[in-house]
Amino acid sequence: MRRAARASAPGKVIIVGEHFVVRGSLAIVAAIGRRLRVTVRSGGKGIVLESSMLGRHSAPLPGQGAAAKVSPVLEPYIAVLRSLAARGYSVVPHTILVESGIPPRAGLGSSAASMVAYALSYSAMHGDPLSAEDLYSVAMEGEKIAHGKPSGVDVTIAVRGGVLAYRRGENPVDIRPGLTGVTLLVADTGVERRTRDVVEHVLSIADALGEASTYIYRAADLIAREALHAIEKGDAERLGLIMNAAQGLLSSLGASSLEIETLVYRMRSAGALGAKLTGAGWGGCVIGLFKEGEVERGLESVVESSSQAFTASIAEEGARLEEF
């Protein structure tokens, strides 16, 4: 066994399909150039997490010592560790160092990237890096603790990278983007929320609507298919219209908020071809599709209403091991 190993995974934006993917609709998701890195070092006592964003947390190793209350921040990592142990990896004391360029709790997949990078680095420390299939399965155990009923799309894109068409229970399909001359603007509302709470709220509204909600989900699925074709054909104008329609559907099920709508309309007023929330909603981030020559105006338009904003490129590479 090595003394340490390091791995990273990309963040993501959901172009269309968040929430609806939970009940079988299509989602289009893209990895972005911002990455999260995890370094695992053996030694010490128990399991220790060190993160500039999440602080320092520690706990006994699973199955060792008296039962102790574990920080909610550590619980997903422990779930991943248990899954690794079930696959034959030895459980040893170690420290997890997290370095992230992905804002946490913002809908950009930081949680999934962290679970993926942790699972890959821990398995690599033992000299046997997980395969992509096993990496997905192990990381999902952590996401279930973090989010309750994750669709799996965040973990999939963190493992694979690129742009994917994703439907729950089916193999993801790689999309070859034909878009040129456009870029994504990402603006953070600065409002933190628990993904699990938003997912449960949206599902409760869908259930309350009864049969009517089936038409909303059907429309979301059709919109996602149109988005796939627009991306492949390079039709940015059409993709923008589709993003706007998707925002309306998400709002109808209670996923939006005043902060989100403010950023959406500021981007549209600044020339965005389309703008919508990405991720769970109730806060987190908004994405806007801009022509490259107009994105600076978009950045200026969201300065006062966002905690941070940046342009995002598509990351072709998913999870990877890294040298020290």
Swiss-Prot record:
UniProt cross-references to PANTHER family, sorted A to Z: MEVALONATE KINASE
Cofactor: Mg(2+)
GO function term, MF aspect, one: ATP binding
Organism: Aeropyrum pernix (strain ATCC 700893 / DSM 11879 / JCM 9820 / NBRC 100138 / K1)
Keywords: ATP-binding, Cytoplasm, Isoprene biosynthesis, Kinase, Lipid biosynthesis, Lipid metabolism, Magnesium, Nucleotide-binding, Transferase
Function: Catalyzes the phosphorylation of (R)-mevalonate (MVA) to (R)-mevalonate 5-phosphate (MVAP). Functions in the mevalonate (MVA) pathway leading to isopentenyl diphosphate (IPP), a key precursor for the biosynthesis of isoprenoid compounds such as archaeal membrane lipids.
Protein family: Belongs to the GHMP kinase family. Mevalonate kinase subfamily.
One GO biological process term: isopentenyl diphosphate biosynthetic process, mevalonate pathway
Record's keyword annotation contains Transcription: no
Subunit composition and interactions: Homodimer.
Protein's name in the database: Mevalonate kinase
Localization (cell): Cytoplasm
A Pfam cross-reference name: GHMP_kinases_N
Pathway listed: Isoprenoid biosynthesis; isopentenyl diphosphate biosynthesis via mevalonate pathway; isopentenyl diphosphate from (R)-mevalonate: step 1/3
